[in-house]
Curated annotation (Swiss-Prot):
Recorded GO CC terms: cytoplasm; Holliday junction resolvase complex
Gene name linked to the record: ruvC
Protein name as catalogued: Crossover junction endodeoxyribonuclease RuvC
Oligomeric and partner information: Homodimer which binds Holliday junction (HJ) DNA. The HJ becomes 2-fold symmetrical on binding to RuvC with unstacked arms; it has a different conformation from HJ DNA in complex with RuvA. In the full resolvosome a probable DNA-RuvA(4)-RuvB(12)-RuvC(2) complex forms which resolves the HJ.
Co-factor: note: Binds 2 Mg(2+) ion per subunit.
Leading EC class: hydrolase
Length: 169
């Protein structure tokens, strides 16, 4: 089964697709969707959404996962991140996929073994676990980490998401 991990950001949104067969996890693809900061906020959100729609069409994942938002010190940045996150989450939701959410510490613990792991530790573990990963940016590594986390926790998370959504695919 193919799982999509998403690491939303207004400038760069990371994405990663893994294949899960039994207890084996393999790399399918990873990359980023960039928005043009010269455009309006609405146009940038449309770019992010369209980019994730293209990923969904190209790789056909059956489930998606995203990292929960943390609150920045700058309220305007937090708001923009939330808007980007909404645009990114909307794509798989409209495609009928359940979208699971994980706290950053849970993602790090699932991949590195500790919830306080640094970004470079996450990237190093992703390269170890998924040797074919291209990891254009740390955002792509984070997205693959989110997908791996979902692979580990999906049974519980899927049940919770289905209960919240009242259904799913």
């Amino acid at each position: 089964m193919r799982l999509l991990g998403l690491d939303p950001g207004l400038r760069i949104t990371g994405w990663g697709v893994i294949e899960v067969t039994g207890n084996r996890i393999g790399h399918v693809a990873d990359g980023v969707v960039r928005s043009d900061d010269r455009l309006s906020l609405a146009a940038r959100l449309a770019q992010l959404h369209g980019g994730i729609v293209a990923v969904l069409k190209a790789y056909e994942p059956v489930e998606a996962a995203v990292e929960e938002t943390f609150v920045n010190r700058n309220p305007a940045s937090t708001l923009k991140l939330g808007q980007a996150r909404g645009a990114v989450m909307l794509a798989p939701a409209l495609a009928g996929l359940v979208v699971a959410e994980y706290q950053p510490s849970v993602v790090k613990k699932a991949v590195v073994g500790t919830g306080g792991a640094a970004k470079d530790q996450v990237g190093m573990m992703i390269r170890t676990l998924l040797p074919g990963a291209t990891l254009e940016t740390a955002d792509a590594a984070d997205a693959l980490a989110i997908a791996i986390c979902h692979a580990h926790y999906r049974a519980g998370a899927l049940s919770l998401a289905l209960a919240r959504a009242g259904g799913g695919r």
